[in-house]
């Protein structure tokens, strides 16, 4: 969450105009940055001459704005503190008076004891009328005081009597303290509430453990509600004390909230100054933060003595409340008082996966926003929401929502599936059923008629239902046996390897390690368009190696925001830069085994799986050549703005923390173990077991939370599991062997390179039009089986080359996650940077170049390694 949002949500509504104008200061920073770049370019236009006329430096102008904000905060704080101090003094006198009169040892107030409570309860039915005639009548005004003055957290209580007695005198319908005049509302306190005293952490940690105690108190309250008015009427000498008790309790609650709000006001403004100065230093390359924060620390609201005074008064108010209502238990008093505080919205670090989920939600919202709103006085639609079909059996109404292209596609696929089952094209029943399932699942994945992960769940369901799986003897498995086999295949070491990659990506992004490394590299890229483009492409490729090419574009696009923000509106460098990062991320998808989901599928279809060292030996030279070739294409073929001066990306000046070092060491250690996995085969057994190391360490130590785990791209994980299940089904049924035999006979006369050329081209075309991972799940099992049946078998060579080709298919905006992320990029006006034609101009030649490099450079390396 951005601090501007945190400030908005946590500010006291009545004081909203008196907080630091964080958003305005941020706009000023961007304005100063733009002016600085304009002056550096030296353009002899009117804007430049006006800027040169401005004599003050950016530091002076920004300090002037900060001084104005600081003065406003001081001017607001001083009278507000005096107001609360006066209120504190008045309530202190009232409490001392109440304590001397009613809470001393020698008081004569006739409080009801348990014995009296029992007697009064037993004699209520027989003597109510007589007593009501003898005792003074309770007026409507007094009754209103009783009803409005009580709360549900303890009822009538004073330290001189027991808690059980205190719950006896309460209103029949519990009411909270009415604080509406002060803008207060009772909300559940968040654990992220700012602390005000040493034991507050313990107080908040125990909140959830007090539910049973609260329920017991509520039960006592309900049991004694019937005796309420009877006891007050029996003991009229308590009425004055009770009125004073209710009034004092309300005032203490309001005072506690007011002091706490003032503490929160100081805390939020101090954080705001610190963050906005850090942003200024980072954006303009200044060092203003340290010097100006000294000035902030000397302002009256931020003096240590001022904070200590507020905290001391807050604790004293809690002690008074404890004496008045909680038998002197300050722990309980603080918990109850905090129930009246505003809910605090905590700031949390984002992982890259949470940002991707937010992007997906924004995309969905954009789709929904395209629907035309209907005015209140208009009909929702000129057409009825259903079709009416009249038959001799009656009138049938079918909703119009069933008549669209998606439903038509889904119905067509289902019809094809039923036809394949009804009219077998293969004599063997299991193989024919498997063919029908394979065709249906492939079409559903290709058309996305239903969500991709839902189709993955359809695979095990239809496998068991159609009795497709067979045992080693060729006999069909029963439903129970099929269930065990298919679900056990879906959870395997390859899926755990994917989870391990997601975990590393989450840790590196949450603690800004990946971003710091990227900005440190980009800070040395200079300001020339070609060098900036090349550096960004290398950063995107390197990031894809370790946080996957699904997440790397999101990281890179966030880093280049200062560049995009300061480019002229008519510049085409923004398009070139975004396309370059997307294409480089696709290339980075082949750089390591965890850099893309399709690599996981490739490993699953290799026996034995390629080691990390073998993978790097192929991927690094191919990736570097592809990056240089695509950069040359973009720089000298498509880039027109060659002489613009770009904003400089500045690296952070913060030192590497202990947590960041720990995460880096664990990550590097895991990667080293992956590279040396063959040497530790007897120890770990598989790369999936090594992938458990970062999962256990990062989640076990609390560096990553269950929310981070929930934010993983589970749709991708389930999709990979569905692909593994489909591969198991096609292999077990014998269909894969049959398909491989047919294709093998057709290409038996061709040499290995020509067969590889055919499969690589087929994979490239399929991956360009459907998802990369879907293409890998459908094509790679067939490629492996065909490769193993050739006269010169090289199944691992075919699988590795075809798997890499899946990532290198990048011609269309829908070809892979990086392209889909890039096409959604918008400028500050909400207009997209790229059109489909922009991708076609760069994507088609980039794909063909990468195809040639992989075949001419990658294939000889694979052969040399024994693939």
Swiss-Prot record:
Residues 105-152, 165-228 are annotated as: Disordered. PANTHER family: LOW-AFFINITY PHOSPHATE TRANSPORTER PHO91, SOLUTE CARRIER FAMILY 13 MEMBER. The lineage of its organism: Eukaryota, Fungi, Dikarya, Ascomycota, Taphrinomycotina. It comes from Schizosaccharomyces pombe (strain 972 / ATCC 24843). It comes from the Eukaryota. It is found in: Endoplasmic reticulum membrane. The chain crosses the membrane at residues 406-426, 434-454, 485-505, 537-557, 576-596, 616-636, 656-676, 683-703, 712-732, 755-775, 797-817, 842-862. One of its GO terms (molecular function) is phosphate transmembrane transporter activity. Residues 198-223 have a biased composition (Acidic residues). Keywords: Endoplasmic reticulum, Membrane, Transmembrane, Transmembrane helix, Transport. This is Uncharacterized transporter C3B8.04c.
């Amino acid at each position: 969450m951005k601090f501007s949002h945190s400030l908005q949500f946590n500010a006291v509504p009545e004081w909203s105009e008196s907080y630091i104008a964080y958003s305005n200061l941020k706009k000023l920073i961007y304005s100063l940055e733009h002016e600085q770049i304009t002056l550096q370019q030296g353009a002899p236009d009117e804007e430049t001459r006006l800027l040169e006329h401005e004599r003050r430096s950016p530091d002076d102008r920004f300090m002037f704005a900060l001084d104005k904000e600081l003065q406003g905060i001081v001017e607001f704080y001083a009278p507000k503190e005096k107001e609360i101090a006066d209120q504190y003094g008045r309530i202190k006198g009232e409490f001392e008076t109440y304590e001397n009169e009613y809470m001393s040892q020698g008081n004569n107030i006739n409080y009801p004891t348990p014995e009296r409570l029992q007697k009064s309860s037993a004699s209520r039915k027989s003597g109510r009328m007589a007593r009501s005639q003898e005792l003074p009548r309770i007026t409507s005004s007094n009754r209103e005081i009783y009803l409005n003055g009580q709360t549900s957290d303890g009822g009538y209580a004073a330290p001189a009597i027991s808690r059980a007695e205190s719950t006896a005198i309460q209103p029949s319908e519990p009411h909270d303290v009415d604080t509406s005049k002060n803008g207060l509302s009772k909300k559940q306190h968040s654990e992220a509430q700012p602390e005000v005293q040493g034991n507050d952490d313990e107080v908040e940690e125990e909140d959830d453990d007090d539910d049973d105690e609260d329920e017991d108190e509520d039960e006592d309250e309900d049991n004694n509600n019937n005796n309420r008015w009877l006891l007050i009427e029996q003991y009229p000498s308590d009425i004055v004390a009770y009125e004073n008790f209710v009034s004092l309790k309300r005032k203490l609650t309001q005072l506690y909230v007011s002091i706490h709000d003032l503490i929160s006001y100081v805390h939020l403004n101090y954080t705001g100054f610190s963050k906005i100065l850090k942003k200024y230093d980072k954006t303009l390359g200044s060092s203003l933060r340290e010097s100006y924060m000294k000035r902030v620390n000397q302002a009256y609201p931020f003096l240590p003595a001022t904070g200590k005074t507020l905290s001391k008064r807050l604790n004293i108010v809690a002690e008074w409340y404890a004496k008045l209502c909680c038998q002197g238990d300050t722990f309980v008093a603080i918990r109850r008082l905090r129930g009246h505080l505003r809910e605090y919205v905590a700031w949390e670090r984002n992982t890259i996966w949470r940002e991707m989920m937010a992007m997906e939600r924004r995309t969905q919202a954009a789709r929904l926003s395209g629907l035309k709103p209907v005015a209140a006085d208009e009909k929702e639609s000129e057409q009825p929401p259903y079709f009416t079909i009249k038959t001799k059996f009656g009138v049938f109404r079918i909703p119009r929502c069933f008549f669209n292209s998606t439903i038509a596609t889904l119905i067509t696929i289902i019809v094809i599936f039923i036809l394949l089952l009804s009219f077998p094209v293969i004599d063997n029943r299991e193989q024919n059923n498997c063919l029908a399932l394979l065709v249906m699942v492939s079409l559903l994945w290709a058309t996305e008629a239903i969500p991709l992960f839902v189709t993955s769940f359809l695979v095990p369901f239809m496998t068991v239902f159609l009795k497709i799986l067979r045992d080693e003897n060729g006999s069909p498995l029963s439903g129970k046996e099929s269930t065990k086999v298919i679900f056990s295949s879906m959870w395997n070491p390859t899926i755990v390897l994917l989870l391990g990659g997601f975990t590393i990506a989450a840790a590196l992004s949450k603690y800004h390690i990946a971003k710091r490394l990227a900005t440190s590299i980009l800070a040395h890229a200079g300001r020339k368009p070609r060098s900036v483009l090349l550096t960004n492409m290398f950063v995107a490729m390197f990031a894809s190696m370790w946080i996957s090419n699904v997440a790397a574009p999101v990281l890179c696009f966030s880093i280049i925001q200062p560049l995009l923000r300061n480019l002229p509106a008519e510049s085409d460098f923004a398009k070139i830069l975004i396309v370059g990062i997307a294409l480089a991320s696709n290339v980075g998808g082949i750089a390591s085994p965890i850099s893309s989901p399709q690599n996981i599928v490739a490993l699953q279809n290799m026996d034995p799986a390629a080691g990390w060292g073998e993978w790097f030996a192929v991927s690094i030279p191919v990736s570097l050549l592809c990056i240089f070739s695509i950069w040359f294409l973009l720089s000298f073929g498509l880039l027109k703005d060659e002489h613009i001066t770009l904003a400089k990306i500045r690296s952070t000046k913060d030192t590497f923390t202990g947590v960041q070092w720990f995460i880096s060491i664990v990550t590097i250690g895991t990667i080293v173990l992956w590279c040396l996995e063959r040497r530790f085969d007897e120890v770990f057994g598989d790369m999936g077991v090594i992938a458990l190391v970062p999962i256990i360490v990062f989640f076990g130590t609390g560096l990553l939370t269950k929310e981070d785990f929930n934010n993983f791209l589970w749709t991708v994980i389930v999709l990979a599991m569905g692909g593994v299940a489909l591969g198991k089904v096609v292999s077990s049924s014998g269909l894969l062997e049959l398909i491989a035999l047919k294709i093998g006979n057709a290409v038996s006369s061709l040499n290995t390179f020509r067969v590889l050329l055919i499969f690589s081209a087929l994979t490239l075309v399929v991956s360009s039009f459907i998802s990369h991972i879907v293409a890998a799940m459908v094509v790679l099992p067939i490629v492996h089986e065909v490769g193993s049946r050739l006269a010169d078998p090289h199944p691992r060579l075919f699988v590795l080359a075809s798997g890499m080709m899946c990532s290198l298919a990048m011609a269309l905006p829908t070809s892979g996650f990086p392209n889909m992320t890039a096409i959604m990029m918008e400028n500050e006006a909400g207009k997209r940077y790229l059109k489909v034609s922009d991708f076609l101009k760069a994507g088609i030649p980039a794909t063909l170049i990468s195809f040639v490099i992989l075949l001419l450079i990658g294939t000889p390396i694979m052969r040399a390694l024994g693939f």
